[in-house]
Regions:
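A solvent-exposed interaction/effector surface
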Residues: 2-176
Length: 176
């Protein structure tokens, strides 16, 4: 009987620690969605076209993030998907940094410009391990667009503003 009591206390204590950790990492934080006007911006990085599960994409993200952390790329680390990544087997992705000024890209990098306009912005402040998946966030964005009679451009941009803040920006074409 004494061993069972110790197990119950031990498991309860572990459960409390896990609950508190989940809370502190932002596990109960909701995605905030709003309509915002976005000024013209640029993304400088490297492009990938292929399967989303291709290891080459993972390597590209890691290498580009390293260049960003080493100061070779300025701005906000971002991943731009041309088309909804949840709806296609083949993806076109630009991995790099977002900035408001046009720059001369480093060797082997490209720069895309994005016009000013209305965007749907979804933000979450949570550690990536407990944050909603990109698929869940994209579904919420699409639901928001439908509720507000908005048509999305097929561009999904994930900005990693802080360790605990991920922002997804999706340009809006026009009202239906």
């Amino acid at each position: 009987m004494q061993i069972q009591k110790k197990h119950i206390i031990g498991w309860s204590f572990l459960g409390i620690i896990l609950f508190i950790s989940y809370y502190l990492l932002g596990g109960f934080t909701e995605v905030k969605i709003e309509l915002k006007e976005q000024e013209k911006f640029y993304i400088t990085g490297k492009k990938f076209i292929g399967e989303s599960k291709d290891a080459t994409l993972d390597s590209l993200v890691e290498a580009t993030h390293q260049a960003y952390t080493e100061g070779k790329l300025s701005g906000t680390f971002s991943i731009c998907f041309f088309g909804n990544p949840d709806e296609a087997d083949t993806v076109e992705v630009l991995v790099g940094t977002m900035h408001t000024e046009e720059i001369t890209p480093p060797k082997n990098y490209v720069q895309e410009s994005f016009k000013a306009g209305t965007t749907i912005v979804a933000s979450i402040e949570a550690e990536a391990v407990v944050a909603p998946s990109a698929t869940e966030t994209n579904e919420k964005i699409e639901g928001f667009a439908k509720e507000n009679d908005l048509r999305l451009k097929d561009i999904f941009i994930e900005k990693y503003e802080d360790d605990f803040k991920i922002v997804t920006v999706v340009p809006v074409e026009q009202n239906r």
